[in-house]
């Protein structure tokens, strides 16, 4: 048995509602968030993202943080899709739902088709596939 199981990513948001709307519409996450509580849990299959407002977190831990301006180049969320064509399709779907384009779909020398978008808080999201069909 493992000492730890890594199954959740936590994101500190400027606006929980905007972030919930983005992830539910763009990627199909589900949530039973009531729109009032500061803590939001969203799931997609076995993946879980927890959202918490930045200001509420700072109040909880009694300290201020500096957040990246624009795109957050310190981490990414990576989503695999079945085929190269799906990368292109999901990239357009993300843009339609408010994502900012960072890198349009590109086939990399190592054989992956990938693209990058950013969510409303500037977090980088990779959508990629290694299957060219």
Label the predicted regions.
Residues 1-8, 30-118, 130-133:
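Vicinal oxygen chelate
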Residues 13-15, 109-110:
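Conserved beta-strand-loop-alpha-helix junction that forms the acyl-donor binding cleft
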Residues 14, 18, 84-85:
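Conserved glycine-rich acetyl-CoA-binding loop
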Residues 19-24, 94, 119-122:
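Conserved active-site tyrosine of GNAT-family acetyltransferases
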Residues 124-127:
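Short glycine-/small-residue motifs
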């Amino acid at each position: 048995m493992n000492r730890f199981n890594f199954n959740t990513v936590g994101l500190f948001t400027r606006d929980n509602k905007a972030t919930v709307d983005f992830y539910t519409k763009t990627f199909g996450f589900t949530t039973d968030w009531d729109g009032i509580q500061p803590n939001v849990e969203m799931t997609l299959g076995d993946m879980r993202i927890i959202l918490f407002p930045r200001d509420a977190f700072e109040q909880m831990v009694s300290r201020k943080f500096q957040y990246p301006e624009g795109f957050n180049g310190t981490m990414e969320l990576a989503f695999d899709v079945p085929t190269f064509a799906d990368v292109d399709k999901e990239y357009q779907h993300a843009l339609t739902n408010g994502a900012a384009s960072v890198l349009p779909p590109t086939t990399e020398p190592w054989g992956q088709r990938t693209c990058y978008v950013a969510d409303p808080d500037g977090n980088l999201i990779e959508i990629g596939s290694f299957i060219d069909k």
